[in-house]
Regions:
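Alpha-helical segment proximal to the catalytic Tyr-Lys
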Residues: 128, 172-173, 244
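Short C-terminal tail/terminal secondary-structure segment
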Residues: 18-19, 148, 236, 247-261
Length: 261
């Protein structure tokens, strides 16, 4: 199935590496003009240079810090004063790992800004043009821990759950405007973030990182870690006209890891 996003403008959070980068590259390959958002200007500048422009696309980037909401808000206000977005990908790096007992109120507030507040604010700004044009796509990058929490990811579990619940509520309100909103429940994917998590876990358990990664792979019915390109393919479909009747849902992409259904 060929997916064409020619003429669409996409804003992709956390897109200097990992899943976010794969999403940006896949949307651009399908014809979308993509604006990347992340902290690393050097990485984003190189990615933008590599993105295709054969379908008339124009790409760019914004250097942002999702953990600094006042600064982020000012940047988004300035961006949306001059630009419109058809496809919004709410994606950021996750908060620091740790159990609920290890996290204080300040860390909870930082995680709230990072995973929830920025996504809500950006979505509200993007919706103005989406509603005017009677077309839009909002996709939240969440986690399978929304359904089956991991105790060492207490902040991610909590705030991503809030994001998914908010997304479901908003999806009902904007469906009449031909705007879809879906959340993706992310399993294990081969990214720097995953490497960081299993390396930290290995240090706590006094075992090798390879042992922890192997145990992760063994938990997955498909017996492997996912490729970010596989993730990006799902996002590209949800961003397309072919997915026009899919909204308000949470879609796991985890190789069968979730035991619930």
């Amino acid at each position: 199935m060929e997916i064409l996003l020619t003429g669409k403008n996409a804003l992709v959070g956390g897109s200097s590496k990992g899943i976010g980068r794969a999403i940006a590259e896949r949307l651009a390959a399908s014809g979308a003009s993509v604006t990347l958002m992340a902290r690393s200007e050097d990485l984003m500048a190189r990615i933008v240079e590599s993105l295709p422009t054969d379908k008339g696309q124009s790409h760019g980037y914004l250097v942002v810090n999702f953990s600094d909401f006042p600064a982020y808000k000012a940047q988004m206000d300035a961006f949306f004063a001059k630009n419109t977005v058809d496809i919004l990908i709410n994606n950021t790096q996750g908060p620091a790992a740790g159990s609920a007992l290890e996290k204080g109120i300040e860390e909870c507030q930082t995680a709230f800004d990072l995973l929830f507040k920025c996504a809500v604010y950006t979505s509200n700004l993007a919706l103005t043009a989406m509603q005017k044009n009677s077309w839009g796509r909002i996709i939240n990058v969440a986690s399978i821990t929304v359904r089956e929490p991991l105790n060492y990811l207490a902040l991610s579990n909590s705030l991503r759950s809030a994001l998914v619940s908010w997304g479901k509520s908003l999806a009902i309100d904007i469906a009449k405007d031909n705007i879809t909103l879906n959340s993706i429940l992310t399993g294990y994917f081969d990214t720097e973030r995953l490497t960081q998590l299993y390396t930290q876990k290995a240090e706590k358990m006094n075992v090798t990182a390879e042992k922890v990664r192997g145990d992760m792979e063994a938990q997955v019915p498909m017996q492997r870690i996912g490729d970010p390109e596989e993730y990006a393919n799902l996002v590209c479909f949800l961003a397309s006209q072919q997915a026009s009747y899919i909204t308000g849902t949470s879609i796991p992409i985890d190789g069968g890891l979730l035991k619930s259904y």
